[in-house]
Swiss-Prot record:
Keyword terms, alphabetized: Flavoprotein, FMN, Monooxygenase, Oxidoreductase
Function description: Hydroxylation of nitrilotriacetate.
Protein residues bound to FMN: D58, T107, H157, Y161, S231, S232
PANTHER family with a match to the protein in the record: ALKANESULFONATE MONOOXYGENASE-RELATED (PTHR30011), C2H2 FINGER DOMAIN TRANSCRIPTION FACTOR (EUROFUNG)-RELATED (PTHR30011:SF16)
Catalytic reaction annotation: nitrilotriacetate + FMNH2 + O2 = aminodiacetate + FMN + glyoxylate + H2O
Listed Gene3D superfamilies: Luciferase-like domain (3.20.20.30)
A Pfam family assignment: Bac_luciferase
NCBIfam families the UniProt entry points to: FMN_nitrolo (TIGR03860)
Enzyme Commission identifier(s): 1.14.14.10
Domain of life of the native organism: Bacteria
UniProt name for this protein: Nitrilotriacetate monooxygenase component A
């Protein structure tokens, strides 16, 4: 790896960890799911490790899947801890008060929200955090979300992304509708603002009609950092045009290199440099002094997932397929029905099963800890070797760390893996800037609405 090549590291914060068995792990603390001090302790640990950001994934439904699927699987659902039990904007605003440097990122869907509301929320969060906010832009494919917003089914794939593109464009205009320096607050002159620096955007499009301006000053970062996680063709196009960070699930180095090259190769037609997009594959890390001890941690937590829930979860990831009709200790059938949910994630999981000849039981044990992301175990050196190889061979610019069980696995990562990366000179030893854009090496966007001076 080149001497100046630094990797970026964030982490996904789900209550007791991303593994569905994580809440049952001996050191887990599921009783603290709504305790702000619990969240603060873990985020401060990540900040001690100089990580770029904390990511709170969000959904506007309690469970995944259709109403019928949920009704059939009530008991199975009760075997798993919910992925979230607090609304993320409120939680991140609280965490901003107990942290100084780490970025704070959350999800908001373009399918069941309005641009003005999202522009206002993220601009406010960016001010509260002093420039540390990020928006993970998603389009909703979860039927449970559709059912919470008066729909019998979700919006079709292509339509979701068309709406998302316009949605993001409107939000950008709204963030830029109040120029830097628009508010003079001149007490002597009796003039609070400059009308020439406050703009009505007057957007009229296929999906939205928005006059503006925003009633929040321009964010400290200009725009909060835009994150995107879709790996389908429309998702990669959206990322190439608008995203600054991409979360992705890639199981192999070859797949990672192909995705990296593909999504960055689409950017030039939008007038963007590939340096302005950070590709961060998700990875679940089990680290210990020996490889066998690390693997034992993986096996322990994997065996804590009840079969009924494992089948339900795998069924949802594969597109609501009834897996109970198949032998749990046999292979995944070749002729699976069409997917109803995320097509790219389904493909990752099917390829994993075929490549490693996994039974259905082995497959749900693998994905219950990662939802299609890569799981690795080993010593700090072995983990760092893999990280370094992926960045050196342009399969990643860094990683979105998925702690399997909390708080222990975050402590392990910060105490053992981070020092090894720092020793190699490929991860920072101190924060060098104050904003999330600074951490990621991203420039502050120019104002698209302001007239040239």
């Amino acid at each position: 790896m080149g001497a100046n090549k630094q990797m970026n590291l964030g982490f996904l914060f789900q209550i007791s960890g991303v593994h569905y068995g994580g809440w049952r792990y001996p050191s887990a603390q599921p009783h603290r799911a709504t305790d702000i001090q619990y969240y603060a302790e873990i985020v401060r640990t990540a900040e001690r490790g100089k990580l770029d950001f904390c990511f709170l994934a969000d959904s506007i439904a309690a469970y995944e899947g259709s109403a019928d699927q949920q009704d059939r699987s009530k008991d199975a659902l009760m075997a798993a801890e919910p992925k979230r039990l607090l609304e993320p904007f409120t939680l991140l605003a609280a965490l901003a008060m107990v942290t100084e440097h780490i970025g704070l990122v959350t999800t908001a869907t373009t399918t069941y929200n309005e641009p003005y509301t999202m522009a206002r929320l993220f601009a406010s969060l960016d001010h509260i955090t002093n420039g540390r906010a990020g928006w993970n832009v998603v389009t909703s494919a979860n039927l449970a979300e559709a059912h919470n917003f008066g729909r019998d089914g979700h919006v079709e794939h292509g339509d979701r992304y068309a709406r998302a593109e316009e949605f993001i464009n409107v939000v950008f205009k709204l963030w830029d509708s109040i120029e830097d320096g628009a508010y003079l607050r001149d007490k002597l002159a009796g003039r609070y603002g400059l009308s020439e620096k406050i703009h009505f955007i007057n957007h009229i499009g296929e999906h939205f009609k928005v006059r503006g301006p925003l009633n929040v000053p321009r964010p400290p970062q200009g725009h909060p950092v835009i994150v995107q996680a879709g790996s389908s063709h429309p998702g990669k196009e959206l990322a190439a045009r608008t995203a600054e960070v991409v979360f992705t699930a890639q199981q192999t180095l070859a797949d990672g290199k192909a995705f990296y090259s593909d999504v960055k190769g689409r950017m030039a037609k939008y007038g963007r440099s590939s340096e302005n997009l950070k590709v961060l594959p998700g990875v679940v890390v089990y680290v210990a002094e020996t490889e066998s001890e690390a693997k034992a941690k993986y096996e322990t937590v994997s065996n804590l997932v009840p079969p009924d829930f494992g089948l339900f979860m795998l069924s949802d990831l594969l597109g609501e397929i009834d897996l109970k009709q198949f032998d749990i200790d046999g292979p995944l059938p070749e002729d699976l029905p069409e997917a109803k949910g995320s097509q790219s994630r389904r493909e990752v999981i099917i390829n994993l099963a075929r490549r490693e000849n996994l039974t259905i039981r082995q497959l749900y044990q693998r994905v219950s800890g990662a939802s299609g992301h890569r799981s690795i175990w080993g010593t700090p050196k072995q983990i760092a070797d893999q990280f370094e190889q992926w960045v050196y061979e342009e399969a990643a610019d860094g990683f979105n760390i998925l702690p399997p069980y909390l708080p222990e696995s975050m402590n392990d990562f910060v105490n053992f893996v981070v020092p090894e990366l720092q020793r190699r000179g490929i991860f920072r030893t101190e924060y060098e800037g104050s904003t999330l854009r600074d951490h990621l090496g991203l420039a502050r966007p120019k104002n698209s609405v302001a007239k040239p001076s």
